[in-house]
Amino acid sequence: MSEDHGKDYTLESDSELRFEIEQKDAKVLVSLVSGFAELFGTELVKKKQYEFGVGAKVAIFTYQGCVLHVSGKMDVCYISKETPMVQYVNCHAALEQFRMEAEEKDRYGPVAMVVGPMDVGKSTLCRILLNYAVRVGRRPLYADLDVGQGSIAISGSVATILIERPANVEEGFAKTAPLVYHFGHKSPSGNSVLYNAVVSKMAEVTLQSLNSNKRTKSSGIIINTCGWVKGSGYAHLLHAAKAYGACAIFVLDQERLYNELLRDVPKEVHVVLLPKSGGVVERSKELRHEARDQRIKEYFYGNARAPFYPFSFEVKFQDLRLYKIGAPPLPDSCMPIGMKAEDNKTKVVAVTPTPALIHHVLALSFAESVEDDVIGTNVAGFCCVTEVDMERQAVMLLSPQPRPLPPNALLLWSELQFMDNHT
């Protein structure tokens, strides 16, 4: 580990400075002294100081050369000339060509999926492509189908947002008015039938929303996906590509997946194999769990720059309308006539509060009744069960909004848990 109290790094054209921060409470300050540089597609402002904290894995790239001043404790810090950024900008140029044609003919802009195994930089490539699109005046939609490590909403959900300005260097994209659908599991394998149903619904609504604004219509959609690419995971990728009508699929770092997609998607879909960045870091299960936990914590409490102050309040069992999507499997012989085993996977069933509910995250659905299309209805937000009192027949909820819950509030169970030890 190196302790760096301040050093200038001179980068040649088409190179990048990479650093990682793993120590808790460590922070690194970066400023652009001269030249031009960007972080995942967002331009750095000259002389402005940017702060990065624990968990940051940063790659600052320059097309023309620059000088960066860096200070603070880093676990790794080096300059690399081996970077795939030129290939990534070529992908942006190809998408921009599609957008110009779509604009002329009043058609939908390109729908591009980014796919690949875990830890190859899928969400980073999405961020780069979205930033480049916004910088040339586009307003693309960003759809995140990664229920394990989602970057828009918390894990266990899929979501879409409109991108109107480049991502903040330190905090990423503004998550204003996201369209969020509840899934309730950390992997599509938790309920494959439900996952496909939720993806189909979000694709339908997202494609319809393109018609609401001419600029967004021609700007298209960038889609991030899960890192599960074999067996059923691969089937989910094919399902998503069909549901969204993808015209381009960018495959990161896996020739096998690239060749399978070439074989299985329609010939008019452009499938492109891209290298991953050498700066991509493989994450352990523990790190993935920590990242999920951090996303939930930030949902309720914000961060140091923009803290939130959530509310805790009690709800009686009798006022709690709590449901789960997916009933336990039944043998075919026990199924009602005309009902298939898959139907059970999307059945909405009531949940009786027990002590096992503690720490579980619940989604607040916009659906008002189980008679509504609960799966196809987006969610307003999330709360967390911090206490279950069987004697008093009540639960304590942690919520971004004060009491009471909205009238006819319908809460959906999730396997995600959050230990609220915030002080």
Curated annotation (Swiss-Prot):
Keywords: ATP-binding, mRNA processing, Nucleotide-binding, Nucleus. ATP binds at E16, K57, D119, V120, G121, K122, S123, T124. Pfam families: Clp1, CLP1_N, CLP1_P. Its main location: nucleus. It comes from the Eukaryota. InterPro entries: Clp1 (IPR028606), Clp1/Grc3 (IPR045116), Clp1_C (IPR010655), Clp1_C_sf (IPR038238), Clp1_N (IPR032324), Clp1_N_sf (IPR038239), CLP1_P (IPR032319), P-loop_NTPase (IPR027417). One of its GO terms (biological process) is tRNA splicing, via endonucleolytic cleavage and ligation. One of its GO terms (molecular function) is polynucleotide 5'-hydroxyl-kinase activity. It is found in: Nucleus. CDD domains: SIMIBI. GO terms for cellular component: mRNA cleavage factor complex; tRNA-intron endonuclease complex. Belongs to the Clp1 family. Clp1 subfamily. PANTHER family: CLEAVAGE/POLYADENYLATION FACTOR IA SUBUNIT CLP1P (PTHR12755), POLYRIBONUCLEOTIDE 5'-HYDROXYL-KINASE CLP1 (PTHR12755:SF6). Required for endonucleolytic cleavage during polyadenylation-dependent pre-mRNA 3'-end formation. This is Protein CLP1 homolog. It comes from Drosophila sechellia (Fruit fly). The gene is cbc.
